[in-house]
Every structure is written in C-alpha cells, then in structure tokens.
Regions:
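Extracytoplasmic catalytic/substrate-binding loops of multi-pass membrane glycan-assembly enzymes
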Residues: 101-136, 148-160, 170-173
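Transmembrane-helix motifs of polytopic, lipid-linked glycan transferases
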Residues: 173, 177-198, 236-240
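Aromatic, loop-rich ligand-recognition surfaces of beta-strand-rich domains
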Residues: 1-124
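Short acidic/glycine- and proline-prone juxtamembrane loop motifs at membrane-interface regions
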Residues: 175, 179, 216-229, 277
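Transmembrane-helix signature of polytopic, membrane-embedded enzymes
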Residues: 190-213, 232, 249-256
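Membrane-interface transmembrane helices that cradle and orient dolichyl/undecaprenyl
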Residues: 198, 237-260, 271, 293-300
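Juxtamembrane segments of multi-pass membrane glycosylation machinery
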Residues: 143-149, 160-181, 200, 215-216
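Transmembrane-embedded, aromatic-rich helix segments that form part
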Residues: 262-263, 277-295
Length: 302
C-alpha cells in the first residue's frame, strides 16, 4: 500500500458528442472507494463539484493499494486522476487492474495516460478561471465540432476564442489572447471618442490612461470572457455616432453622414452578436441619434 494525502481530478477536452442527451458537467457525482485486499472497500472521497478545465483537489490522509471509481450520474465526466505522494514530490505511479470498458471507446486507461501533465500546485495559469469554465468550453466545442454545452449568449465572441484555439492549441494563453487584444484595441478607440468630444490630445490621453489602469478593464481583458469583444465594438459604434452627431448639419454631405450611421449600426450589430449587453448600448445610440435629429430639425426651422 502507498500513502497519499490528496486526490487530483480534472475534466478537460473530451468527446461531448458521446452522450448528447446529458450535459457533461465534470465530476458531478463520482465516489472513490479504497481497499488493501480487494475485499473490504471504504469510501474515501466523493467528487461532486468539479468544473471543466479546473482541478478538483480532495485533501486527506490515506494509505491504500487499490482505488475503485463508482459513477452515479450520466452527467459525470473525468479526464485525469492523480494521487499526490505524502512528501508532495509528485504523483504515485498507478495502473489499471480491472476495467469493464477496456475494449470500448473510453477505457479506464484514459484516466491515467497524462500523469506528466498534472500540476502539483495549479494556479490560474494552468486552469480555467471564473466564467472561462463556460466560454472556453463552448469555444473548444465549436473548434472541434462538438455538441455545445450552452448557448446563453450570441456566439461571435466564443467563435473568436475558438479560432484562437484552432490556431494555437488548447491552453490558457490561447483562449485568453483574443480578449487581451480586444482590451488593447479599446484604448485607441476611446482616444478617438475623447478627441471628438474635447478636441484636446492631453485630455484624450488621460482618459485612455484611466481606461488602461481600470481594474475591471484589466480583469476582464486578461481572461476569456465575452466583455472585451462586446465593449470594443460598442465603443466603435459610439465613435461613429459621435462622428455623425458632432458634424455640422450644413457642411456634412448626406452620403458621408449615411456612411457614419451605417458604420455605427454595423458595429452595434457586431457588439450584440458578441453579447446581449450590446442591446443596452443600442438604446443609448438611438437616444443620441433621435436627439440629434430633433436638434437639426429645430436648427433648420430657424
């Protein structure tokens, strides 16, 4: 028998097409039993709250030779399992003794075939964080033609993350890169808006710096969420609306004004296709537009 004091489990990329009638939600209800003689079994852990791409670590103090997994839910899914050595220097070497699915498409050996990839002290550089457990999962499913777990939001932002996964592989850097780029692109767009409003470079730079230093901007742009994409396109739509509203009624050619409004509308639609919050921004655009038309009409009547 071997001593171990932690059980590491993780659910990563899998085949969600294998059971489309049930959501695969990680270690939903898996019991672990242990024995030293294959006769008497003791339940040592119950895995109930594991999320996709995140480690679930059960702490304890055990000394057993055999481990048995009993799955009580068709929603459960598990990609890899490891048993931390008592001295915390690595994981115990393990092998499969009995497997009812040995000749099936998902043998038990798949649970221990990537022991070298398990992380002793996982951080958010190694696993999903916050809503990444939803968006990254959907992106991976899109990138690989899998049955989708959820479609709460429009899928443009998720498809952008999926494209990055296809290009650079399934890893935290890959799924976080598009949002970081979108966060950077917000700065020149905001600078352009402020330049239209204040006509001053210094104030525009100060406003852009405040956005760059904003905690919420940094937080959402460094993880794989949909906010950076939606907000980037919202800012673009407002830039063109400001461009239209701040132009002179007498000097702005009608064709040019139509182009401004068209670009604003296009970016508005793109923002909504990234996340439903773009709809709220659309209300603001409508208020700006109709207010401007009323002002122009009153100016014309004079």
């Amino acid at each position: 028998s071997e001593k171990f004091d932690a059980i590491y489990t993780i659910y990563g990329e899998g085949d969600t097409n294998s059971n489309p009638s049930a959501y695969q939600i990680g270690t939903n209800n898996i019991h672990l039993y242990a024995s030293n003689d294959l006769q008497e079994w003791t339940r040592i852990a119950s895995l109930k709250q594991g999320n996709i791409y995140t480690y679930a670590i059960e702490q304890g103090n055990w000394q057993y030779r055999y481990i048995k997994l009993v799955d009580l839910s068709e929603n459960s899914s598990l990609s890899e399992i490891g048993f931390l050595k008592e001295d915390h220097t690595g994981f115990l070497p393990i092998s499969i003794l009995r497997d009812k699915q040995k000749d099936g498409p998902y043998p038990g050996s798949l649970l221990i075939d990537e022991q070298d990839k398990l992380v002793l002290s996982p951080t958010y550089y190694d696993q999903a964080y916050f809503d990444e457990i939803y968006h990254v999962r959907n992106a991976w499913e899109i990138a690989n033609g899998q049955y989708m777990y959820a479609n709460v939001h429009p899928l443009l932002g998720t498809n952008i993350i999926a494209l990055s996964i296809r290009l650079f592989g399934m890893n935290p850097l890959s799924w976080r890169l598009p949002g970081a780029i979108a966060g950077v692109l917000m700065l020149p767009v905001l600078y352009g808006i402020l330049k239209l409003l204040f006509k001053r470079n210094d104030l525009s730079l100060i406003g852009s710096f405040l956005l760059a230093a904003d905690f919420m901007h940094i937080t959402t742009s460094r993880i794989a969420t949909l906010e950076p994409f939606s907000i980037l396109f919202i800012l673009c739509s407002f830039y063109w609306m400001f461009k239209y509203c701040m132009s002179s009624f007498y000097t702005l050619p009608m064709q040019k004004g139509i182009i401004y409004l068209l670009l604003s509308g296009i970016f508005m639609g793109i923002s909504i296709s990234a996340k439903w919050t773009g709809c709220y921004a659309a209300v603001g655009l409508a208020i700006m537009l109709f207010t401007n038309w009323i002002q122009r009409y009153l100016e014309y009547k004079k």
